[in-house]
Amino acid sequence: MAQGTVKWFNAEKGFGFISTENGQDVFAHFSAIQTSGFKTLEEGQKVAFDVEEGQRGPQAVNITKLA
């Protein structure tokens, strides 16, 4: 499982990007966030996730927020 920092996330549109520890930007969709209730991420938040190859490049799945 990779770790990274939320680069930006638009809650209205339901997506954003996570910067990995090696500097790669990975697409993040709200449906991949593993939490109950309103699924959103905050800029600068630390997260753990798996990476899958999506239709337009690397995509984060199984996103969990780190304390």
Curated annotation (Swiss-Prot):
Keywords: Activator, Cytoplasm, DNA-binding, Stress response, Transcription, Transcription regulation. InterPro entries: Cold_shock_CspA (IPR012156), Cold_shock_domain (IPR050181), CSD (IPR011129), CSD_CS (IPR019844), CSP_DNA-bd (IPR002059), NA-bd_OB-fold (IPR012340). It comes from the Bacteria. Induction: In response to low temperature. Coiled coil: none annotated. PROSITE patterns: CSD_1 (PS00352), CSD_2 (PS51857). Homodimer. This is Major cold shock protein. It comes from Streptococcus pyogenes serotype M6 (strain ATCC BAA-946 / MGAS10394). The gene is cspA.
